[in-house]
């Protein structure tokens, strides 16, 4: 996993890893979730990948659009 940039500070996301149609996020509490083409869907995954690479807006996007619609809790 690579560290999430968190350019504005205060994000709950600390790290991410992504592939062609998925992204895995680790949060400050250690919880790790996988999001994919099934949950929450390809459009959301693509946007989450874009925001993760940019290092800003990911936590806000999750709270506003994705919430608990993840594919799996990994840790």
Residue ranges and their predicted role:
Residues 1-75:
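A charge-rich, low-complexity, intrinsically flexible signal that marks solvent-exposed coils, linkers
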């Amino acid at each position: 996993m690579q560290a999430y940039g968190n350019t504005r500070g205060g994000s709950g996301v600390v790290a991410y890893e992504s592939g062609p149609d998925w992204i895995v996020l680790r949060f400050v509490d250690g919880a790790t979730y996988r999001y994919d083409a099934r949950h929450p869907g390809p459009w959301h995954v693509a946007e989450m990948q874009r925001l993760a690479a940019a290092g800003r807006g990911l936590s806000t996007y999750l709270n506003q659009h994705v919430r608990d619609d993840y594919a799996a809790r990994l840790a």
